Amino acid sequence: MNSMYRIYPQKRYRKTLTILERFAPKGTTILDLGVRNPFSEVMEKEGYIVNNTQGEDLDLFPEKLADYTGELVTALEILEHLVNPFEVLQHLPAQRLLVTVPLRLWFASAYRNDKDPRDCHYHEFEDWQLDMLLEKAGWRIKYREKWTHPVGKLGIRPLLRYFTPRYYAVYAERIIDDEYRVKKI
């Protein structure tokens, strides 16, 4: 198993699952962007039908999303890894979307794994940036929530993590016809 999943992010999983349950009843078919991961299993154990993408490079081939179906798409800790999340958001094959992203922290650098070029954050959003991206890509935000992520270490930065929101979740629905634009895909 990937080393990043050795210790489950309990708080993030709990918060994400609570939001999912609010907007998607058990039995909902979910397209979970990204390869299968521990949270895919959590969703299945909670009664959801989960399909994952297969590791396609969605930056280069967002149209591959047409090969998938789902009543709701989850993009959980995914958009920050994409060079161009706008194209992916436009090509999602569902009318409902749950997104979580790490927020940009003013006191920490963006995440980067020097050993794996796919494991880095091209974007660490501020909440308003993700909101604008979603709206521009044709989604209407219905719910949003932020939370902190304390790390249990000593120091100034760990202390700041107790007070500074680290994660941002958004539930949105596709705009079918809007005064600003008409969805064309």
Tell me the role of every PLM-derived stretch.
Residues 133-139:
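A structural motif corresponding to the C-terminal end of an alpha-helix
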Residues 72-78:
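A short beta-strand submotif of the Rossmann-like class I SAM-dependent methyltransferase core
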Residues 83-87, 109:
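Short N-terminal helix/helix-N-cap motif within the alpha/beta-hydrolase-1
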Residues 31, 76, 99:
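Active-site flanking residues adjacent to catalytic metal/cofactor-binding acidic residues
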